[in-house]
Amino acid sequence: MEGLQPVRSLFTRFFQLEAASGLLLIAAAVLALIINNSPLSYLYGGLLEVPVAVQVGALNIAKPLLLWINDGLMALFFLLIGLEVKREVVDGHLSKPSQVILPATAAVGGMVVPALIYWFINRDNPAAVAGWAIPTATDIAFALGVLALLGKRVPVSLKLFLMTLAIIDDLGAIIVIALFYSGTLSSVSLLLAAACLLVLVAMNRLGVIKLGPYMIVGLILWVCVLKSGVHATLAGVALAFCIPLRTRNAESSPLLALEHALHPWVAYAILPIFAFANAGVSLAGMTVDSFTHPVPMGITIGLLLGKTVGVFGLTWVAVKLRLAALPAGAGWGQILGVAILCGIGFTMSLFVGSLAFAPGSSEYAGMDRMGILTGSFFAAVIGYAVTAMASRKTSIA
């Protein structure tokens, strides 16, 4: 049991960080909206378009600041997701099939139903259909943060259900990005990336436990993936899967150490910076028609209704078919509340939206953000209210 203590303390720290960072994410998004709809809007747009170049010998990477944030900083976010997924699969809640069935089933429903709703609303517009994956994402920071506001009124099992569901949802998002949002591929860069991956695997098998060598090869891997046409953030996931969880010295774990070190940076810096850079929607000239356009409407309905129906519906099916049981101490009202909270797409939806509708090159770049912010806001408010009412009834009973 003592060996599980680091994992338990890490989960406690993780939940506290994600809950606290939710308020910072909201503040960053609101600040972006205020600045971009004020006389200072030119500063906001100008800042994100500032060219940043890095050159090492013949290698030159030049991008506007916005893309450095989306391709660079978010690679660290996906590195953290990869570490969490590996830990859960090897030694956590995803290591036991009986514990995976319910959240995995719910996660599948929470991705498929929103995608179908968005596709149905935008089916006559091929350019708009490219955003089908936007409402399939769940922002783990916001969802857990809202649930944390209820404190001890919700059972720990319900929090674990939401966390596991969100991690599986993130894994699904990674697969979607790899399969559907990669550009023209460069065979040379892909071969170099594969070589880096082989080196990382070899280091793992040879028992290398120092994080420094992994980070150096990981940086080279990121550059190769960036140049390959596959989205660069996937390099973070690949690197994470190669970091060893266990060592011959049972008291140390490179994976847990890196995860522990990354959490505050991701929670309090990377995600708020990303939110600030991507949530600045211009409200100038916005009318009711702006919200009823198929793109924002598809995203809003997909997040709010699609996530609820998908997560709650497949959870109900799994329980009724006796494939799994409800989380201990949780009632159906609380499951409904959590299903609604899964509609908080925010950062993950904004990220997928930046791939589907690239800022500056797609007419839907601003529309998708309107749908994401609207759907996420109502999902947070309604989800909190439903979960709070259901928890009160459960505690009274």
From Swiss-Prot:
Keyword terms, alphabetized: Antiport, Cell inner membrane, Cell membrane, Ion transport, Membrane, Sodium, Sodium transport, Transmembrane, Transmembrane helix, Transport
GO BP terms, alphabetized: regulation of pH
Gene3D superfamilies found in the cross-reference section: Na+/H+ antiporter like domain (1.20.1530.10)
Transmembrane segments: 15-35, 42-62, 65-85, 101-121, 129-149, 160-180, 183-203, 219-241, 265-285, 299-319, 335-355, 370-390
Domain of life: Bacteria
Any one of the GO CC terms: plasma membrane
Membrane topology: Multi-pass membrane protein
Function: Na(+)/H(+) antiporter that extrudes sodium in exchange for external protons.
Protein family (similarity comment): Belongs to the NhaA Na(+)/H(+) (TC 2.A.33) antiporter family.
Protein name per the record: Na(+)/H(+) antiporter NhaA 1
Taxonomic source organism: Pseudomonas putida (strain ATCC 47054 / DSM 6125 / CFBP 8728 / NCIMB 11950 / KT2440)
